[in-house]
A protein has these predicted regions:
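Short, charged/polar, Gly/Pro-enriched secondary-structure boundary elements
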Residues: 141-147
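Zn2+-dependent peptidoglycan hydrolase active-site motif and core
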Residues: 86
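Core segments of cupin and vicinal oxygen chelate
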Residues: 5, 16-70, 109-135, 141, ...
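Vicinal oxygen chelate
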Residues: 10-18, 60, 64-72, 89-106
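Short consensus segments that form the blades of beta-propeller domains
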Residues: 3-4, 91
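Ordered, amphipathic secondary-structure segments that act as subunit-interaction surfaces
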Residues: 71-79
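The feature marks the first
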Residues: 2, 9-11, 33
Length: 156
């Protein structure tokens, strides 16, 4: 059985936080690992981010990643206060588990599959380095969280 995304491989569990620097320290201490660097979400000119189908040039965040197993990450996200799937979650629910992310090929087909399953597209854009694209879907009704797809482009 292929499922909606054609994969059951989990790549990431994402958490929304108010203070990424403090949250990184706590997660690192809990996991017994080094505190990772903080990354910016990237420039709109590169990412082309949309939110609810509209351009979202001001939506950005700070991120940190913990590689906890081969191919599996914990992602911490601190939204910048502008309208986004991240800020919406923080405003509605506070800090907590936000999404499960899955590696995919052909994001466009996955958008169609997810929307047919009743999970509307919330946010979409390119990685900050333009090396791939992501999409967030509202799966709160079905799965009690958001779903993110991650498509990494082959290196040229």
């Amino acid at each position: 059985m292929a499922g909606v995304l054609g994969t059951s491989t989990l790549a990431q569990v994402g958490f929304i936080v108010r203070d990424i620097e403090e949250s990184k320290k706590v997660f690192a201490e809990f996991l017994g690992v080094e505190v990772p660097p903080t990354w910016d979400g990237g420039e709109y000119e590169v990412t082309g981010t949309t939110y609810l189908g509209q351009p979202a040039p001001e939506a950005n965040c700070l991120m940190a990643f913990f590689n906890i197993a081969p191919g599996l990450q914990i992602e911490l996200i601190q939204p910048n206060g502008k309208p986004s799937a991240w800020q919406m979650y923080l405003d509605e629910y506070g800090e907590g588990m936000h999404h499960l992310a899955f590696p995919v090929n052909d994001t466009e087909k996955k958008v169609i599959s997810c929307e047919a399953f009743g999970m509307p597209l919330l946010r979409r854009g390119l990685y900050g380095n333009a090396g791939g694209e992501y999409a967030y879907f509202d799966a709160r009704k079905q799965l009690k969280c958001f779903i993110e797809t991650l498509e990494t482009y082959p290196e040229k």
